């Protein structure tokens, strides 16, 4: 992370993060030292405020209205430094997760969260982007139409008739 500090040099705790952003829970692995926990809490705090600045949202939106949990240094997956666990609605980062991992996983969480408002027949573990790719029926709403336009720009070629090179990889 190369951005400005949002803490003015002060240390924050994971409890501070939970309270301020409204996360449902925060779990820290038992093998995480106190020093690692402090460094991580400060980095999480700054990364979450970077996301707030970029998206022009407030603290409560970052936790998707209190529906998200965080895990650090626990419950990892082989070959993954970070992942979003949809059944738990949990952002999980390993101790060695790199810069940008939190934002990347947050967008998976948002994709999952928004599906309940995006789709006419939502399912608990369905993601909006996949449902859109599968031509699922959408709830008619101006924001949903804008999101569908974004998906078209991200996933289809210039004329909108086929998957783009990124999707095909």
Language-model features, listed with the residues they occupy:
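Zn2+-dependent metallopeptidase catalytic core
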Residues: 34-63
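Active-site-flanking segments in enzyme catalytic domains
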Residues: 1-36, 59-169
């Amino acid at each position: 992370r190369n951005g400005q500090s949002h803490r003015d040099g002060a240390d924050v705790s994971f409890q501070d993060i939970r309270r301020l952003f409204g996360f449902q829970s925060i779990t820290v692995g038992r093998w995480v030292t106190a020093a690692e926990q402090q460094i991580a809490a400060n980095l999480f705090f700054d990364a979450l405020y970077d996301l707030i600045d970029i998206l022009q949202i407030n603290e409560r939106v970052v936790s998707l209205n209190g529906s998200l949990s965080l895990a650090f240094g626990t419950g990892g997956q082989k070959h993954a430094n970070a992942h979003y666990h949809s059944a738990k609605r949990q952002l999980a980062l390993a101790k060695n997760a790199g810069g940008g991992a939190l934002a990347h996983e947050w967008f998976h969480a948002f994709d999952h969260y928004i599906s309940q408002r995006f789709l006419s027949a939502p399912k608990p573990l369905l993601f909006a982007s996949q449902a859109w790719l599968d031509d699922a029926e959408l709830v008619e709403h101006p924001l949903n139409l804008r999101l569908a336009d974004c998906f078209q720009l991200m996933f289809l070629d210039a004329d909108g008739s086929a998957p783009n090179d990124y999707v095909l990889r």
